[in-house]
Amino acid sequence: MDFNLNDEQELFVAGIRELMASENWEAYFAECDRDSVYPERFVKALADMGIDCLLIPEEHGGLDAGFVTLAAVWMELGRLGAPTYVLYQLPGGFNTFLREGTQEQIDKIMAFRGTGKQMWNSAITEPGAGSDVGSLKTTYTRRNGKIYLNGSKCFITSSAYTPYIVVMARDGASPDKPVYTEWFVDMSKPGIKVTKLEKLGLRMDSCCEITFDDVELDEKDMFGREGNGFNRVKEEFDHERFLVALTNYGTAMCAFEDAARYANQRVQFGEAIGRFQLIQEKFAHMAIKLNSMKNMLYEAAWKADNGTITSGDAAMCKYFCANAAFEVVDSAMQVLGGVGIAGNHRISRFWRDLRVDRVSGGSDEMQILTLGRAVLKQYR
């Protein structure tokens, strides 16, 4: 596996550096985080560069650049302080519809290319069905040639502003043998109520509770095949976990570099604190974790490009990077001292964001269970 970037990949990374240096994006991110607002202007700037088309096949007007390129771009964005967690639907969201959607659904989603606007997200989690997805209660029932959706979802990302969501529901006519199907739902339909929730971190991407009261759909609104809901979302989970891990690494690298610069400039007891051995020890441990994360992520990206990545790989990346990155940011915050916890330094935002990532997108505990099963399966 050769992880040296080719000329095209270097061009993408250079473009990211140029964009991030073009203005004071950090002030914009801090404002969006404070007000819990999606940074649309920034995402539009990325879309103008073609970042939202990185994984779209060439026959559909995309770049088909692959996951190694995506990883390089994601890492550099994060290293320079960008909230890449708001971008999760950009690289893969279009392809999901190209694989599973009807032509009408595809046309609606592909119209968002180049806009920077939020377009769709999945609605799976419920008050009584978090990690235990099989316990979901939202139902779809057929009456008089129509489909009616009833139930509630919670902690649904991006749902305050997305015009469409894909809802996982069970067939109300089959209570003894659950059939899980997804439905493409226009959020402007009658019977939908959205309640925005406050959260510790990841504040630039909304998190909502959604209730459905006899929301009327048509058969053409089915997303994918009936009864295939679980199989479809398993693939989405793996993709999301890899992206979360990339975000974790980039954020941790940014915090590490901020702390390193500070340690070389901050003078106490007559010399830079970076000369103190206890501070050097922190940076040694941070560097080990960052290097391990980077190698793990590039290996996973290479596997994804070669069709050999597994759910175990995605779980390993998600678990290790979520925890290692949080530890790096926590250590970097310790180095910064009062500047990191009492001022307006971005590291406090990073700390909040990374703590959330140990729960969202699949909890630490579920990643360990998934990985443990995957490891033992290799030796059967």
From Swiss-Prot:
It comes from the Bacteria. Its main location: cytoplasm. GO terms for biological process: carnitine metabolic process. Its EC number is 1.3.8.13. One of its GO terms (cellular component) is cytoplasm. It catalyses: 4-(trimethylamino)butanoyl-CoA + oxidized [electron-transfer flavoprotein] + H(+) = crotonobetainyl-CoA + reduced [electron-transfer flavoprotein]. Transmembrane segments: none annotated. GO terms for molecular function: acyl-CoA dehydrogenase activity; flavin adenine dinucleotide binding. Pathway: Amine and polyamine metabolism; carnitine metabolism. Its cofactor is FAD. Keywords: Cytoplasm, FAD, Flavoprotein, Oxidoreductase. It is found in: Cytoplasm. Catalyzes the reduction of crotonobetainyl-CoA to gamma-butyrobetainyl-CoA. NCBIfam families: PRK03354.1. HAMAP family: CaiA. Belongs to the acyl-CoA dehydrogenase family. Homotetramer. This is Crotonobetainyl-CoA reductase. The gene is caiA.
